[in-house]
Regions:
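Active-site catalytic microenvironments in core metabolic enzymes, especially phosphate/sugar-handling
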Residues: 1-112
Length: 112
């Protein structure tokens, strides 16, 4: 099929001490968002963890971990898609492609 429109996917960086004010605005404006974790162990800051919990029921949240370690986001109660082997830009493009097909139910398979 021919793709006429790509989905809107935002990107936000997370770090220790992040107040997530900007992230809240971005997540309210996009169909999906890529969160880039810049912590040493790959975890999200407490404020970002809560924000992701709040929004992941109505938008797809993809987490890219810059540390190279595999972090268990489900243990933090997060319903996110992990992109352990992708850069943030690759994850953003993949999310845009996933948004073009509303029949895709398991996004994680595209991010493995």
């Amino acid at each position: 099929t021919e793709i006429k429109d790509m989905g809107y996917v935002g990107m936000v960086n997370d770090y220790i001490g992040n107040d997530v004010y900007t992230a809240q605005k971005i997540m309210a404006s996009y169909e999906s968002v890529v969160v880039v974790s810049d912590t040493a162990d790959g975890s999200l800051s407490p404020a970002m963890t809560q924000l992701v919990k709040d929004v992941s029921g109505y938008i797809k949240v993809i987490v890219v971990n810059n540390s190279g370690s595999e972090y268990d986001y489900a243990a933090d109660g997060l319903n996110v898609i992990t992109a352990q082997t992708m850069t943030s830009w690759q994850a953003r493009i993949m999310a845009m492609l996933c948004l073009t097909d509303k029949n895709i139910t398991d996004w994680q398979e595209f991010f493995n």
